[in-house]
Design a protein with these regions (language model features):
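Nucleotide/phosphate-binding catalytic cleft detector across ATP-hydrolyzing
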Residues: 1-150, 163-274, 281-308, 313-325
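A structural feature that tracks compact, well-ordered secondary-structure segments
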Residues: 159-161
Length: 325
């Protein structure tokens, strides 16, 4: 890549907005607080900290949902703010160039909107790359003739792709991801423990289950019937049971991709293993469940949720593989 203008890789996820340039990677909560007139009052970590504490005249908005832009002007404003925050100073973005990760399932209109968000944020030139192809590069398996099966567990979608020679040959997607678990945990706590918990507490319990060695996890909430503050407990076994539908989704997706792939590539996957990435890749017990269910190696990519944006940055130097908007 050249050095005269700023270069950046972008992954506009539903939960996190990720950037990568020649210096480092950044990750911001992809959320904003807007008032009744639609004016931006807070974004990123500041907005997330205000969730559940807002007065009636303010509301929390996520500009990207299930990988698709739901609010183009707001998405552009947040991206512009993130780019300026990452630059370390409020300089203009004139002449900046970017490569943006585009979901494999995106329609031509959705791809156009993603590029438009980048341009409205101040990016001069935008190139795009399929999310699975970027992830393959980030996982270190791009360009190889051997087959690689990557599974992206996002906030609201889970996708599995067979990659060979830097191309996604087969992709399957389900509209359910790690974020679904939070809603299920909230419902489970309410129905089984008469405890009302928020999305943040549910997410904390989900993540703690992956690290906790004990059998029980304390959770703070409100008594469902009286509304008084209450500290309850969820067992690791309960959380794992709530996670099971996601496990089963991933297993079905992997099986569907293997069934639709040439036998030579399937053999490669049985030797190399399935590669998990995305924000939900480290869900408690997921890799172990898949190893048992699929009878093959399963690995969590070290870069996790940053795999695609890291790969997009690596691919950006190979301009011909990217589509110029």
């Amino acid at each position: 890549m050249g050095t005269r203008s700023r270069q950046v890789a972008i992954d506009l996820g539903s939960a996190r907005l990720r950037l990568r340039d020649q210096r480092q990677a950044w990750s911001f909560p992809h959320v904003a607080i807007v008032d009744e007139e639609g004016s931006l009052r807070a974004w990123g970590d500041q907005a997330l900290a205000m969730a559940g504490r807002l007065p009636p005249r303010l509301r929390l908005v996520r500009p990207v949902a299930a990988g698709a832009v739901a609010d183009l002007p707001l998405a552009a404003r947040l991206l512009g703010s993130a780019l300026r925050a990452a630059s370390g100073k409020s300089r203009r973005l004139r002449g900046a160039q970017a490569v943006v990760c585009v979901p494999d399932h995106a329609t031509s209109l959705e791809r156009h909107v993603l590029r438009q968000v980048c341009k409205d944020a101040g990016i001069h030139q935008v190139r795009s790359v399929p999310h699975s192809v970027a992830a393959a590069a980030g996982a270190g398996v791009s360009g190889s003739p051997a087959g690689a099966l990557l599974v992206d567990i996002g906030e609201h979608r889970t996708s599995a792709s067979m990659i060979a020679l830097g191309t996604a040959l087969v992709t399957r997607t389900v509209k359910r991801g790690a974020g679904s678990v939070d809603a299920w945990l909230m419902r489970h706590a309410r129905d089984e423990h008469a405890l009302t918990i928020g999305a943040r507490v549910a997410e904390e319990a989900k993540l703690a289950a992956a690290l906790e060695t004990g059998a029980r996890l304390p959770v703070r909430g409100q008594d469902r019937d009286e509304g008084l503050p209450q500290v309850g407990e969820l067992t690791v076994a309960e959380i794992r049971a709530v996670l099971r539908p996601v496990y089963e989704d991933v297993a079905r997706l992997v099986t569907a991709v293997l069934d639709a792939s040439p036998q030579e590539l399937v053999d490669d996957v049985f030797e190399r293993g399935v590669l998990l990435h995305g924000g939900g890749a480290r869900l408690y017990g997921l890799d172990a469940h898949l190893r048992q269910e699929l009878a093959m190696p399963v690995h969590v990519v070290e870069s996790g949720a940053d795999t695609a944006v890291e790969g997009a940055w690596l691919l950006a130097a190979k301009g011909p593989v990217l589509e110029l908007a």
